[in-house]
Curated annotation (Swiss-Prot):
Pathway: Carbohydrate metabolism. It comes from Brucella anthropi (strain ATCC 49188 / DSM 6882 / CCUG 24695 / JCM 21032 / LMG 3331 / NBRC 15819 / NCTC 12168 / Alc 37) (Ochrobactrum anthropi). The lineage of its organism: Bacteria, Pseudomonadati, Pseudomonadota, Alphaproteobacteria, Hyphomicrobiales. Keywords: Carbohydrate metabolism, Hydrolase. The keyword Transferase does not apply. Its EC number is 3.1.1.115. GO terms for molecular function: hydrolase activity. This is D-apionate lactonase. It catalyses: D-apionolactone + H2O = D-apionate + H(+). Involved in catabolism of D-apiose. Hydrolyzes D-apionolactone to D-apionate. The keyword Hydrolase applies.
Length: 609
């Protein structure tokens, strides 16, 4: 167990509730806040999660109060019962009565009945099932539909922008040779989305098709009954009985290599003056890219460019400008007006990334696309207004939006997007598991855009903009909240670990540039009041950003981890770089180092012999 102060790791003294581990024969799982995580059979993950979730009109997830929780574990299995209670706007209330049980034969059921005396508004209410992606992506599945028909197909390997399967009643996959897992969903119609779009490490099967209207009302005094049944079929002659957690994590040299990307820093008009005041810190990091943001619909105007020009003059780096184009007047009128303000301020970026502001809002399946000028016209106007700058295209939001609305890559000089790890879940495990999805994201981008120069960022733990609702979530008390515009873990060692692991996870993409932080503010590298680092000091994330900036352009070599869910690594010419992405110490074996111990969320470099 770790004795490290949680405040240093997470930026908050609030710790996550320890899950209750339950077993039924070879089936085991964690019960956490009334939902199920890490459902394994004979040590192999079968399902990542089964949860009963209630979403508000902005797709925020309610955190229900759990009452009358009763857990009974026996030699033959377990049974869990409780009541969950949600309180919505205007004194509306919803209760969910739950019974979860499993027997040693390999069957798990999760039964839930929702009821409301007041009526209750929701975007979605019911079960969500997560299948893992590593070792499962691209594998065969059998899908049973609500009309009884069967499809023998496969899970998508490249990320599917729309639902791969609809009108679902059950899905069956092979968990390991000789073991199949059928997940049966009763009580409503289910469909699957490829959650890798949002960098979630899962395929998500959820209740109620997105093509139906939302939000909708759950009517008073009309109970809604849903049930999930997991059936394991094991035809093997013997169990694995593998002690995969007992051995040290083994790190071995792989056979791929490349060049480390440039590192960028994002600077907004709101943080420009603070960034100027922290110019010494910027020069210490010495990033290769400065990425400036300009959004007229957020109140930005030409006055921002004077600060941008001063910053650009004080630090020798490539300069790029994100423009969220309102598209409310003629495109050429808007772009030339921005170009005129830039010229007046003496701000001459090397590249501009122009995207219609409306494209930052998601268009979910079944929804009507908003009015937007053709991207060909947007890019033509940008070329005319900024003839001496490289033109970037893509999305100022996330990969999801780029995957659903591919840009004409032949018209731009590079493609770009961001990611965010707290779109759907904000617990520590889910955030770190998003790293598994990153290689799938970059492969999917490369499949469309080939060897086009490719940039990612800004990608940070806190969310800078919410494409899926009307706002990002305020987080004044420093909790772990999905879609929050501040996250306490950004201030602790967790973010230092996450950022290096992020960079490792996208090495194979051959990125031109990677931006993982701002310089100041809630997305930045300087500490505020009440953080693990004294106010004005350097957050732990600073160390990773400075390290990556110092390594930019250098050769890297692949290192293969026997437990990539615990430790990730890469090599440079003279060093091994290791990162522990868990809350527990990890023992590692690598090259001449027989056994070394990495503290929770620790980053360590070792000299190669």
């Amino acid at each position: 167990m770790s004795n490290v102060d949680p405040f240093l790791l997470y930026g908050t003294r609030e710790t996550e509730a320890k899950p209750t581990h339950l077993k039924a024969g070879l089936l085991s799982l964690d019960l956490n806040d009334g939902n199920l995580r890490t459902i394994t059979y004979d040590g192999v993950e079968v399902l990542r999660a089964v949860s009963y979730l209630v979403r508000d009109r902005d797709w925020g997830t309610y955190n229900p109060q759990i009452h009358d929780l009763n857990v009974e574990q026996s030699d033959s299995g377990f049974i869990v019962t409780y009541q969950a209670r949600c309180e919505g706007p205007d004194a509306t209330k919803l209760t969910i009565d739950v019974c979860i049980q499993a027997k040693s034969g390999g069957t798990l059921t999760f039964d839930a009945v929702a009821n409301t005396a007041t009526g209750f508004e929701t975007n979605r209410c019911g079960f969500c099932i997560l299948h893992p992606i590593v070792g499962v992506a691209g594998s065969p599945v059998r899908v049973e539909h609500v009309d009884g028909t069967l499809d023998r197909t496969q899970l998508p390997y490249l990320i599917e922008p729309w639902q791969p399967f609809k009108d679902m009643r059950a899905i069956t996959h092979e968990a390991m040779p000789g073991v199949t897992a059928e997940c049966r969903m009763e009580g409503d119609t289910f469909e699957m989305e490829d959650q890798r779009n949002w960098s979630d490490a899962s395929y998500k099967t959820y209740v109620r098709p997105l093509a139906l209207p939302w939000p909708y009302q759950i009517e008073a005094s009309k109970p809604q009954h849903q049930r999930i049944v997991l059936n394991i079929s094991d035809t093997r002659k013997a169990a694995l009985q593998a002690g995969m957690n007992a051995e040290p994590v083994s790190i071995t040299l792989g056979n791929t290599s490349g060049k480390l990307p440039n590192i960028g820093i994002i600077i907004t008009p709101e943080e420009a003056k603070a960034s100027l005041a922290a110019i010494d810190l910027l020069q210490e990091i010495d990033p290769q890219d400065l990425l400036f943001q300009y959004d007229p619909m957020a109140g930005h105007n030409g006055s921002a460019f004077a600060d941008f020009a001063t910053l650009a003059a004080k630090h020798s780096a490539r300069v790029s400008l994100e423009i969220a184009l309102p598209c409310e007047k003629s495109l050429i009128e808007e772009t030339t007006a921005i170009a005129s303000d830039m010229k007046a301020a003496g701000f001459n970026p090397d590249a501009v990334i122009v995207s219609p502001a409306i494209d930052r809002q998601s268009t979910p399946p079944g929804s009507e696309w908003p009015t937007c000028p053709p991207l060909e016209d947007v890019y033509a106007a940008a070329r005319a207004a900024f003839p001496n700058a490289r033109l970037g295209g893509g999305m100022l939001s996330y990969f999801t939006e780029l995957n659903r609305k591919c840009v004409p890559g032949e018209l731009v000089d590079f493609v770009t997007h961001c990611t965010n790890p707290i779109v759907h879940a904000a617990d520590d495990l889910s955030v770190m598991q998003t790293l598994e999805a990153l290689p799938f994201i970059t492969r999917s981008v490369r499949a469309v855009y080939g060897d086009k120069p490719y940039r990612i960022g800004p990608s940070t733990i806190p969310m800078r903009q919410n494409p899926y609702g009307s706002r990002t979530m305020e987080n004044p008390n420093g909790k772990r909240i999905a879609m929050a515009n501040r996250d306490p873990r950004h201030n602790g060692k967790f973010a230092e670990s996450f950022a290096l692991a992020y960079a490792i996870s996208v090495l194979n993409a051959g990125l031109d540039s990677l931006t993982l932080s701002a310089l100041t503010g809630p997305f930045g590298l300087t500490a505020g009041e009440g953080e693990p680092t004294l106010a004005g000091g350097k957050r732990p994330l600073f160390t990773t950003i400075k390290t990556l900036s110092g390594l930019a352009g250098k050769d890297w070599w692949q290192l293969i981890s026997s437990r990539p869910d615990h430790v990730l690594a890469f090599a440079t010419e003279h060093e091994f770089w290791l990162v522990n992405i868990t809350s527990q110490p990890q023992t590692v074996s690598i090259a001449q180092f027989a056994k070394i111990t990495l503290d929770p969320y620790a980053v360590q470099n070792l000299k190669r012999s």
